[in-house]
Amino acid sequence: MAKQSMKAREVVRVKLAEKYRAKREELKAIISGVNSSDEDRWDAVLKLQTLPRDSSPSRQRKRCRQTGRPHGYVGKFGLSRIKLREAAMRGEVPGLKKASW
């Protein structure tokens, strides 16, 4: 199990990313815009740097819903590989069966 503080940190990151999403997209559009002047781009870069670090979506980590484990995450199910295997062995995942060849 992941520490509760790590799970809470991820929740904060998701909330911050949602809060600053529109502002971040607006600034990035100015930076990558063809019609923007160099001065406007520079101002947008400086404003983007003043936003909280955790408001960037790339700082978020996908975690297992049951344990909070960050590695071995299977996105289709939202579980880590370990919990997915346990659920599959109990028959709780419809259509999923152990590979055999």
From Swiss-Prot:
Gene3D superfamilies named in the record: 1.10.287.1480
GO cellular component, one term: small ribosomal subunit
Source organism, top-level taxon: Bacteria
InterPro entries tied to this protein: Ribosomal_uS14, Ribosomal_uS14_bac/plastid, Ribosomal_uS14_CS
Record key words, sorted: Ribonucleoprotein, Ribosomal protein, RNA-binding, rRNA-binding
Gene Ontology biological process: translation
One function term, GO molecular function aspect: rRNA binding
Function as written in the Swiss-Prot or TrEMBL entry: Binds 16S rRNA, required for the assembly of 30S particles and may also be responsible for determining the conformation of the 16S rRNA at the A site.
Record PANTHER family: 30S RIBOSOMAL PROTEIN S14 (PTHR19836), SMALL RIBOSOMAL SUBUNIT PROTEIN US14M (PTHR19836:SF19)
Matching NCBIfam families: PRK08881.1 (NF006477)
Family: Belongs to the universal ribosomal protein uS14 family.
Subunit architecture: Part of the 30S ribosomal subunit. Contacts proteins S3 and S10.
Name of the protein in question: Small ribosomal subunit protein uS14
Species of origin: Serratia proteamaculans (strain 568)
